[in-house]
């Protein structure tokens, strides 16, 4: 039986002699999407397809929870890297590398979790302006950096 498929852009796909129609699905939003094939006469079938984030266009963003803390190896800040693709879709399970100058990092490499965060803690004993940075493990030349100000502990009287 011959069936016609109407695509969302108005095009149609027609079945061949074997009753198969081929369509190419494209999208920019990651996640589950329902595809419906309807035959003339009303019968239809649905299938859920999953689009994943495009790791080739992945980019990292770096947030610092506290950029002004005490340099005593007790005061700390959390670095939180998020990774998204070129369409803004979060990328899970991608490795982020961290570096820092005159600071101690809880880890130098972390994979993004199911919330698409890769987090580490930073401490230091040196007062002054320090640079911390993050990059994707597979794109080490694309680095994003932030400055941290570490201050001396105020003496109490």
Task: Name these PLM-found stretches.
Residues 1-157:
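The feature marks long extracellular or luminal low-complexity segments
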